[in-house]
Design a protein with these regions (language model features):
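Bacterial N-terminal signal peptides that target proteins for export
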Residues: 1-11
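Short, cysteine-centered beta-strand-loop-beta hairpins and adjacent loop/turn segments enriched
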Residues: 95-97, 124-132
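Hydrophobic/aromatic beta-strand elements that line small-molecule binding cavities or substrate pockets
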Residues: 88-89, 103-109, 122-124, 136-142, ...
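A short hydrophobic beta-strand element
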Residues: 113-122
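Short, low-complexity N-terminal intrinsically disordered segments enriched in polar/charged residues
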Residues: 12, 17-62, 161-162
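Solvent-exposed loop/turn segments at secondary-structure junctions
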Residues: 76-78, 124-125, 156-158
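A solvent-exposed, acidic/Ser-Thr-rich amphipathic alpha-helical stretch
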Residues: 34-41, 56-114
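Short beta-strand edge/turn micro-motifs at domain boundaries
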Residues: 27, 134-161
Length: 162
C-alpha cells in the first residue's frame, strides 16, 4: 500500500502534467496564426533586404507568379506577375531612385487558414535630390503549397507631413 508521501507525490505529478498541458493549449489558442504571421513577416523582411540591394527580381519572389496577380496604385491596376515586375522596374530604374526601404506599423488580419490581409506603412529614404517618399499598403496574401504569396497589392503614396 502506498504511503501518504507517495500518494502526495503522484497527485502533484498529475497536477503538474495537467497544468502543463492546459498552459500549452492556452498558448496555442491565444494566437492561432503566430506561425503564419512569422512566415509573412519573414517574407516582408526578405523583400526589404532584396529592395535595399537593388534586386527587384528577388523582391518579387513574395508575389504570386501568376497572370492573376494584381497591383493597384496611383497609375491604375496592373494585372499579371510580369506587368507588376515591369511596373516596379520602370518606376525604380536605379539604386538612387529605389533608396532604402523600411516597412512599419504592420497589422495582420487573417481571413481563414489560407488567407491574410496585411496593412502597413512603407518609407523610402533617398538622396536629397530624389527626396524621401512613403505611404501605406494593403497586401492580400494566400497560402500556396510553396508558402504564402501576395496575390494583390494596393500601395498608395502619402504626402509628407510637415
Amino acid at each position: 500500500m502506498p504511503t501518504h508521501r507517495q500518494c502526495l507525490c503522484i497527485v502533484l505529478i498529475i497536477l503538474a502534467l495537467t497544468l502543463s498541458a492546459l498552459t500549452g493549449r492556452s498558448q496555442s489558442t491565444t494566437d492561432p496564426h503566430s506561425r503564419d504571421r512569422a512566415a509573412i513577416t519573414q517574407l516582408l523582411s526578405v523583400q526589404q533586404v532584396a529592395w535595399n540591394k537593388g534586386d527587384i527580381d528577388a523582391f518579387m519572389t513574395a508575389y504570386w507568379n501568376s497572370p492573376d496577380l494584381t497591383f493597384s496604385g496611383t497609375s491604375g491596376t496592373q494585372r499579371g506577375y510580369e506587368a507588376v515586375q515591369a511596373r516596379y522596374k520602370k518606376s525604380y530604374p536605379d539604386r538612387s531612385t529605389m533608396g532604402h526601404l523600411d516597412f512599419s506599423e504592420l497589422e495582420f488580419h487573417f481571413t481563414g487558414d489560407d488567407g491574410a490581409l496585411v496593412l502597413g506603412h512603407w518609407h523610402l529614404t533617398r538622396d536629397k535630390d530624389k527626396g524621401d517618399i512613403g505611404g501605406v499598403f494593403s497586401l492580400v496574401w494566400q497560402r500556396f503549397p510553396e508558402g504564402w504569396r501576395i496575390i494583390h497589392d494596393h500601395t498608395s503614396a502619402m504626402a509628407p507631413t510637415k
